[in-house]
Structures are given as structure tokens and as C-alpha cells.
Curated annotation (Swiss-Prot):
ADP binds at T12, R16, T266, G309, G410, N414. This is Glycerol kinase. The gene is glpK. ATP binds at T12, T13, S14, T266, G309, Q313, G410. Activated by phosphorylation and inhibited by fructose 1,6-bisphosphate (FBP). It comes from Staphylococcus aureus (strain MRSA252). It comes from the Bacteria. Signal peptide: none annotated. Keywords: ATP-binding, Glycerol metabolism, Kinase, Nucleotide-binding, Phosphoprotein, Transferase.
Length: 498
């Protein structure tokens, strides 16, 4: 009887369940979208119960549709949209407010106040993060401050906090396990990434009671078992957890110091494994925990690009220049260059290494000879320039020259982007056969804990190259193009909203 690992990939817009066999191949997929709530400008929320219902639905569907029995599931791994915050009543199991999503800016005033009080460096030193609404800590404070009776309930020990991984493990285990893993804890602004403990000083600054917080565990461990009524009468080990970007790093078998993966999703995320050393960034990168396994943690440097694949969606839905995302490649390759056109897609500001929330998108270098093809090509190239910005910051902070770049996410199917990426960073770009690396990473973590895979070496053998893109551009051309990009970014920052 063939066994599988079930991976739950709980994302920002949908929940997916994917079955993996021992070779790390996909044996079945189910997906379900859920509703986004926008109660005010800049606020983004989810209904945590809707997320839970969607997860139950995809788990059921992937098992039924692929004629797999529940007793063929050796373990469950969970990967999740990071930072999204749930606070619930531990007796009733009901959330006391919507889940506040990572994108939501509703805690901006809390962050500003803490900065004015001079605590920014304290948070940076202990957590490796910026004092930004992006992270979970200020979201918990906001819920306790704004939901009637919440703070009193929290002080009395009646409320629990969790990121989405914690919420799902708690529900799946029938309320038995209130846990998170090192990678998710490191995104909360409340966890000391050096001591590997919840930090009392930070909790005091955020006025969050410690009794609400989950126990922090390794990313690969049996945390508990599914309660039988949620899983066809079976008690299946819940055995792996990691935040989405860290799971992708693991799924790409980036186990060695200096290994790098880049995800081209709606936004872009680059992570470098820095081994057992938490590298302090001087270049606007985040220092975070990659994963905890075998009794130790691996750290990572992370760079965030706010607009990556969503720039292609903009060409399709906003400007109607293309009918489908793949069409962008054929337009881009009809011309040999952009003829000096640069698109800076700072639609929601600029991420790493600039961290400029006031910047807005801009186009430079237009002439009467500029055609649609030049514009589309310039938009695709912007994904690659932004990646070089992040990679240079990583090399500078870590002292490691990146030897190859493993890639995943929707935009990696675009061969033009992959080749231009290799050219502009002067590094080989490696596209794997299995591009569901986030779900695969969670599966690997769970599989290691239950003996489905023996070791990381076992997993590394599963990684297979689909195509390698080597740099072909000469040095002079590469640097000239990149200088133009830097100039365009600088000009974009000059032209800010008032």
C-alpha cells in the first residue's frame, strides 16, 4: 500500500491540499479560494473559520478525488501565509475578531508610536525584523485594544493567539496542541531569535500577555495527531510546520550556508540560508529563522519585493496590453531591447533594500518610437532588476557570493524572465521540475519527522533540474543596463506623493 504525505498550503487567497509520494512527486491537488475583507482603506482581513472550512474541504477533496484512503497518509505538513494573526477564545474555539492579514496596515499608528518612543532598534536587535505593521505583534495588540473585553479575557487566560499554522494545528488536533514553529515565531516581533524564546521586554512593550502565546517547537516534529472525527476516523501525525517562504527554501533543498532561492509570486521573496549564524543586516534585509530541525536552528536573510508577478497581472488586467500572462513572453522577445525604457513598479512603495513606502510606480525613457513590446519587456525586466537589488544586499551582508539561484513561483514559467535574470545578476538560474516548492517543503519537514524520508540527503536527491539558464550578456552591457535601473529608482523616489 503506497503511503503519502499530505501538505496543507494555506495561502493569502486560497487553501490547497497536495499529496506527495516518496519521490517528492505530486499525486493529487485540491484548491479552494476564500473571501477577502477590506473594512477600511489599507485594512485586509480574513475570517479564520472560513480558512478552517476551506482547509477541511481541500483535505477531503484531495483524498476522495485520488482514491486515497486516510490510513495511507503517513503525516501532515502545514505551510502558511506568514504573520496573519488570529486571536480566539480557548473555551469556545471562536475567533474574537477577523484574522488580520500580513498585508494589512491597520497597526501603523502602533508602530509609529513605538518608533517615537525609541524602541525600533530594540525590536530590530532581538527579532531581526523592522517595526512594521507587516508583522504579527502589533496586530495582537490592536485586537486586544479594540475588541471589547478582549484585554481582560487575555489577562485571565481565556484567549489564545496564533499565526495561521497555530490555528490549524489547534483545530486539527481537537484543541490538544497550541504550538508554532521557529520560522513562524520569528515573524511575530515577540520572539527573540537569538535566545529562541518569547521575549518578556517585547511582550511588555506590546502589552501582550505571555499566557496567550503558543509553545515554540522545531519545524519537524510530531506535534500531535488529527482528532479522528476530522480525518475519517484516523489519528494522523501532524508533523511539520513552516512559514511559506521558509518552506520554499526547504523544498528547494537549500540546506547549505549560502544557498539561495527566489520566489516570483504576487510579490518576490529571496531567502539565503546563513547556517547557524544570525547575520545582522546593514542593507535593509530581514534576519529570520529558516527552520529548526535536528535540535538546532538555521537562520536566513530575507529580501522582500512588493511587486513581482503582480506587475504582469497589471499588464493584463489594468492596462489590457496582454490577454494572458504567458503572452507577455512572446511580446517581450519580439524586440531586442527596451530601447532605454524602464518601468519601476513601485505601486505600493519599494521593498528591500529601499523600504520606501511613499514611492509610487513610474516609467522612464519613453520616446515616439516606444511600442507596446518595449513597454512589456521593460515591465518583465523590472522583476529581474529588483532581484539583483536584493541579491547584492545579501552578498554584502553575508560576505557570500551567490553561485546559483534556485527559483519558483508563477513567473518562472516565463523563459524570457529567467534568461534576463541570469544575465543581469551574472549567476546561473535553476528552475526545478517540481515548482510547488512551498507545499513540498512542508511535506519534507513532516516526512522527516515520521521517517517517510530518512534525512536531508535523502530529500536533496529528489530535487531535479528542469532547466538551467546561464548568463550570456557581456559585462559592459549588464552594468550599463543596471546603472539605468538605479537611476530610474532614484528618480522615482524624488517624485513622491505629498
Amino acid at each position: 500500500m503506497e503511503k503519502y504525505i499530505l501538505s496543507i498550503d494555506q495561502g493569502t487567497t486560497s487553501s490547497r491540499a497536495i499529496l506527495f509520494n516518496q519521490k517528492g512527486e505530486i499525486a493529487g491537488v485540491a484548491q479552494r479560494e476564500f473571501k477577502q475583507y477590506f473594512p477600511q482603506s489599507g485594512w485586509v482581513e480574513h475570517d479564520a473559520n472560513e480558512i478552517w472550512t476551506s482547509v477541511l474541504a481541500v483535505m477531503t477533496e484531495v483524498i476522495n478525488e485520488n482514491d486515497v484512503r486516510a490510513d495511507q497518509i503517513a503525516g501532515i505538513g502545514i505551510t502558511n501565509q506568514r504573520e496573519t494573526t488570529v486571536v480566539w477564545d480557548k473555551h469556545t474555539g471562536r475567533p474574537i475578531y477577523h484574522a488580520i492579514v500580513w498585508q494589512s496596515r491597520q497597526t501603523q499608528s502602533i508602530c509609529s508610536e513605538l518608533k517615537q518612543q525609541g524602541y525600533e532598534q530594540t525590536f530590530r536587535d532581538k527579532t531581526g525584523l523592522l517595526l512594521d505593521p507587516y508583522f504579527a505583534g502589533t496586530k495582537v495588540k490592536w485586537i486586544l485594544d479594540n475588541v471589547e473585553g478582549a484585554r481582560e479575557k487575555a489577562e485571565n487566560g481565556d484567549l489564545l493567539f496564533g499565526t495561521i499554522d497555530t490555528w490549524l494545528v489547534w483545530k486539527l488536533s481537537g484543541k490538544a496542541a497550541h504550538i508554532t514553529d521557529y520560522s513562524n515565531a520569528s515573524r511575530t516581533l515577540m520572539f527573540n531569535i537569538h535566545d529562541l524564546e518569547w521575549d518578556d521586554e517585547l511582550l511588555e512593550l506590546l502589552t501582550v500577555p505571555k499566557n496567550m502565546l503558543p509553545e515554540v517547537k522545531p519545524s519537524s516534529e510530531v506535534y500531535g495527531k488529527t482528532i479522528d472525527y476530522h480525518f475519517y476516523g484516523q489519528e494522523v501525525p501532524i508533523a511539520g510546520v513552516a512559514g511559506d517562504q521558509q518552506a520554499a527554501l526547504f523544498g528547494q533543498a537549500c540546506f547549505e550556508r549560502g544557498d539561495v532561492k527566489n520566489t516570483y509570486g504576487t510579490g518576490g521573496f529571496m531567502l539565503m540560508n546563513t547556517g547557524d549564524k544570525a547575520v545582522k543586516s546593514e542593507s535593509g534585509l530581514l534576519t529570520t529563522i529558516a527552520y529548526g530541525i535536528d535540535g538546532k536552528v538555521n537562520y536566513a536573510l530575507e529580501g522582500s519585493i512588493f511587486v513581482s508577478g503582480s506587475a504582469i497581472q497589471w499588464l493584463r488586467d489594468g492596462l489590457r496590453m496582454i490577454n494572458s500572462a504567458p503572452q507577455s513572453e512572446s511580446y517581450a522577445t519580439r524586440v531586442d531591447s527596451t530601447e532605454g525604457v524602464y518601468v519601476v513598479p513601485a505601486f505600493v512603495g519599494l521593498g528591500t533594500p529601499y523600504w520606501d513606502s511613499e514611492a509610487r510606480g513610474a516609467i522612464f525613457g519613453l520616446t515616439r518610437g516606444t511600442e507596446k513590446e518595449h513597454f512589456i519587456r521593460a515591465t518583465l525586466e523590472s522583476l529581474c532588476y529588483q532581484t539583483r537589488d536584493v541579491m547584492e544586499a545579501m552578498s554584502k551582508d553575508s560576505g557570500i557570493d551567490v553561485q546559483s539561484l534556485r527559483v519558483d513561483g508563477g513567473a518562472v514559467k516565463n523563459n524570457f524572465i529567467m534568461q534576463f535574470q541570469a544575465d543581469i545578476v551574472n549567476t546561473s538560474v535553476e528552475r526545478p521540475e517540481i515548482q510547488e516548492t512551498t507545499a513540498l517543503g512542508a511535506a519534507y519537514l513532516a516526512g522527516l519527522a515520521v521517517g517517510f524520508w530518512e534525512s536531508k540527503d535523502d530529500i536533496a536527491k529528489n530535487w531535479k533540474l528542469e532547466e538551467k539558464f546561464d548568463p550570456k550578456m557581456d559585462e559592459g552591457e549588464r552594468e550599463k543596463l543596471y546603472r539605468g535601473w538605479k537611476k530610474a529608482v532614484e528618480a522615482t523616489q524624488v517624485f513622491k506623493t505629498e
